[in-house]
Amino acid sequence: MTRPVRTRFAPSPTGFIHLGNIRSALYPWAFARKMKGTFVLRIEDTDVERSSQEAVDAILEGMAWLGLDYDEGPYYQMQRMDRYREVLAQMQEKGLVYPCYMSTEELDALRERQRAAGEKPRYDGTWRPEPGKVLPEPPAGVAPVLRFRNPLTGTVAWDDAVKGRVEISNEELDDLVVARPDGTPMYNFCVVVDDLDMGITHVIRGDDHVNNTPRQINILRALGGEVPVYAHLPTVLNEQGEKMSKRHGAMSVMGYRDAGYLPEAVLNYLARLGWSHGDAEIFTREQFVEWFDLEHLGKSPAQYDHNKLNWLNNHYIKEADDARLAGLAKPFFAALGIDAGAIEQGPDLVSVMGLMKDRASTVKEIAENSAMFYRAPAPGADALAQHVTDAVRPALVEFAAALKTVEWTKEAIAAALKAVLGAHKLKMPQLAMPVRLLVAGTTHTPSIDAVLLLFGRDVVVSRIEAALA
């Protein structure tokens, strides 16, 4: 194909957008960027009852968060109704579509008879004009639907970039309704007109659309359009092996941001959820665009793995700038009841991020683990009884005294701790655990010297002495 590459993401704004949905934006975006092409955003909002501005906003917000910028759009199908009606009128003039007066009740009865006879339920062409055929008299006061005159013979075939060669006999396809009785164009028709008008060369979408493809190809050919390359992506499964959906517990795209995931981690994970480049697991956005191709799209359903996402997010958190993490963490601190004033009065937040990030899978987890720096310690009675024993109290007193005069560096704190351990013949946990408990309120912290350094001399000494008084 010599035409400049033009891809599209065409979601329906009917509610929830999860990772499986947004993957259908990621791959066409990446392919357009790889091929120096154009990425088009189209909002397919013909389902007026279910579509909402809130859902549109969620789509736009999710794309922006992941950095999936579009070159054209967003186009809204409801704003293009005049164009669809114009094309329908042209097709009706050429005999490519025709009015059908079969009622819903008649169509249901026809399908029941076909099922009873062991036949595939389908429209039988009662109102389809043919040479020499006498059509029924149109019923008075009944508005017809418009149906597309699907070819009666031959096959519809395309070489799907994922599924390979697909062939459907036209005998399997009935005449599709392309406009409702009130004249409103139908979804499958609007899609074809949009793809034609927008010059779409590659349609990369979920394989739940594959059954629409032969009908769309026939309409496109009737309009004189060039058939695009199709790539129908296998579905994304949740961890239980079910199709990913809100009903089955899927999280929204922005839910990942709100849970403390970094967009680069989610994008990296999403890229591998149905595509691969050798054994590469971790790669930048730029590498992904450079490597992306349709040939390496997976042919089997991809299964979501939350632990894998956490592993990737931890990697990107460790690589992230500490000041950036500090900014991202503030809303999570606020949710814990730690306001800006408490953070301002406590240890330097950027330094805290640098110390605490390595162990965390999410930014939310960093904030939870770092809350000890911005709260008064409140160790439980059982923990105090276990760790702050009469045997260790003299060592705690001596350690607090030593900290009053040492140079306030990580190395000097570690040396003071080692000296007290030696003098009292204690092992590291016997002293480090009670110090952690009295200063931070928990025994679970990174290296004791690094933690004390951030708390600061005055806080450390005063908390140990107050607990021993």
UniProtKB/Swiss-Prot annotation:
Gene Ontology MF annotations: ATP binding; glutamate-tRNA ligase activity; tRNA binding; zinc ion binding
Top-level taxonomic group: Bacteria
Q: Where does ATP bind?
A: K246
InterPro entries per the UniProt record, alphabetical: aa-tRNA-synth_I_cd-bd (IPR045462), aa-tRNA-synth_I_codon-bd_sub2 (IPR020751), aa-tRNA-synth_I_CS (IPR001412), aa_tRNA-synth_I_cd-bd_sf (IPR008925), Glu-tRNA-ligase_bac/mito (IPR004527), Glu/Gln-tRNA-synth (IPR000924), Glu/Gln-tRNA-synth_Ib_cat-dom (IPR020058), GluQ/Sye (IPR049940)
Q: Ranges of Basic and acidic residues compositional bias? A: 118-131
Query: Where found, per UniProt?
Result: Cytoplasm
Q: CDD domains given for it?
A: GluRS_core
Keywords linked to the UniProt accession: Aminoacyl-tRNA synthetase, ATP-binding, Cytoplasm, Ligase, Nucleotide-binding, Protein biosynthesis
Which example biological process does GO assign this protein?
Answer: glutamyl-tRNA aminoacylation
Place the motif 'HIGH' region on the sequence.
11-21
Tell me which GO cellular component terms the UniProt record holds: cytosol
Q: What class of enzyme is it?
A: ligase
**Region annotation Disordered: where it falls in the sequence:** 118-138
| Reaction catalyzed | tRNA(Glu) + L-glutamate + ATP = L-glutamyl-tRNA(Glu) + AMP + diphosphate
Q: Which segment of this protein is annotated as the motif 'KMSKS' region?
A: 243-247
| Quaternary context | Monomer.
Q: What does this protein do?
A: Catalyzes the attachment of glutamate to tRNA(Glu) in a two-step reaction: glutamate is first activated by ATP to form Glu-AMP and then transferred to the acceptor end of tRNA(Glu).
Q: Which PANTHER family match?
A: GLUTAMATE--TRNA LIGASE, GLUTAMATE--TRNA LIGASE, MITOCHONDRIAL-RELATED
Q: Which family does it belong to?
A: Belongs to the class-I aminoacyl-tRNA synthetase family. Glutamate--tRNA ligase type 1 subfamily.
Q: What is this protein called in UniProt?
A: Glutamate--tRNA ligase
